[in-house]
UniProtKB/Swiss-Prot annotation:
Keywords: Disulfide bond
Keyword Metal-binding: no
Protein name per the record: Cardioactive peptide CAP23
InterPro entries (UniProt xref): GBP_PSP (IPR003463)
Task performed by this protein: Has excitatory effects on a semi-isolated heart from larval Manduca sexta, causing an inotropic effect at low concentrations of peptide and chronotropic and inotropic effects at high doses.
Family as reported in the entry's similarity comment: Belongs to the GBP/PSP1/paralytic peptide family.
Pfam families with a match to the protein in the record: GBP_PSP
Disulfide cysteine pairs (residue numbers): 7-19
Keyword Disulfide bond: yes
Signal peptide: none
């Protein structure tokens, strides 16, 4: 995964660098 761009489409980076769904 390319963390520079973010995460899987539909997810966003959190402050701790993980990904969470935005839905």
């Amino acid at each position: 995964e390319n963390f520079a761009v973010g995460c899987t489409p539909g997810y966003q980076r959190t402050a701790d660098g993980r990904c969470k769904p935005t839905f």
